[in-house]
Amino acid sequence: MQQIKTALLSYGMSGRLFHAPFIHVLESFQFYAVWERSKNGAQEKYRDVKTYRTFEEILADDSIELVIVNTPNYTHYEYAKKSLEAGKHVIVEKPFVTEAKEGEELIALANKKKKILSVYQNRRFDSDYKTVKKIVREEWLGKIVEAEFHFDRYKEEIGIKKHKETPGPGTGALYDLGSHIIDQALQLFGWPDAVFADIRIIRPLSQVDDYFEVLLYYTDMRVRLHSSYLVREALPGYILHGTKGSFIKAKTNVQEEALDKGIVPGEDNWGIEPESEKGLLHTEKHGEVIKKYISSERGAYADYFTEIYKAIRENCKAPVTAEEGLNVIKIINAAFKSSKNKKVITL
């Protein structure tokens, strides 16, 4: 197996939790380098990793095949573009970019360079979403007529990360959390006909949006996507209703919690939700009414990286294509336009 030498462009929370553990533990990857301007956080944890002080050093190292752009949102376009131009394969943290035209340019460049360009939509590989996906795919609810996804939290205080709390391209809840549930909705239900959105600032000291409600219009279905930073008592993460029944599932975070505790990916019980988090299925099949709790699917962020390896080495499709990441940005751009003009935007 020819390992893929991989470089991270940051070792903050994203690099520490969602990338480094996987490219270190998976045999198909080598956590080869990291860009840290002054600290040595990655090297303290992973002794063999090289620490570069400039982005240019990453680009100049010809042994690096894959660059993970996990820097602030407004930098994604610039760093992804320069990485592709340097002949690297690229993974970009969600959100892909801040404007659709940037994504279109990057896709064209990746095609020209014949390089893999993927967006890290890791929430596709969470237990809760995988369980919802199975219920929908197996048609337990009949034809879906209504779906509601929540990504709420309680965070009254303003965060310490200035790039997340200062108004500018790519900041706010819709880019940060909305990119997850928009992607999930598009994967389950496809491209909508129109979008309507209400995007607001609800915390007294916040300068960026911390509340949104996005309504996706389909011919025979509506999908409501909601997030608020002032939800102390969590609502279900997923509520789906169909012609045959309903499914209600709590939002969980078992992989992130395990990673934050330093648990190595792949250990026993990795990605398995506790029994208390089972989703409630109430439906009808073959004339029989069924009401029961459904065990969750196993979450596996590692699957994303396994598929990336196949995309690079075996010319397979990336687990999340740049085009799929671009579609999320198109919805976000349309949602901001809708909220500003207070009208439905046809897509």
Residue ranges and their predicted role:
Residues 50-54:
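Short acidic-hydrophobic, aromatic-tinged amphipathic segments that line or gate anion-handling sites
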Residues 33, 65-66, 146, 222:
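Short, Asp-centered acidic motifs that coordinate Mg2+ and/or phosphate
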Residues 66, 72-73, 77-124:
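Beta-strand-loop-alpha-helix segment that lines the small-molecule cofactor/substrate pocket
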Residues 183-267, 302-316:
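Contiguous beta-strand/loop segments that form the cofactor/metal-binding neighborhood of enzyme cores
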Residues 123-205, 342:
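Predominantly a Rossmann-like dinucleotide-binding segment in NAD(P)-dependent oxidoreductases
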Residues 1-46:
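N-terminal Rossmann-like dinucleotide-binding module
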Residues 1-3, 66-68, 115, 293-295, ...:
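C-terminal helix-rich "cap/oligomerization" subdomain common to oxidoreductases
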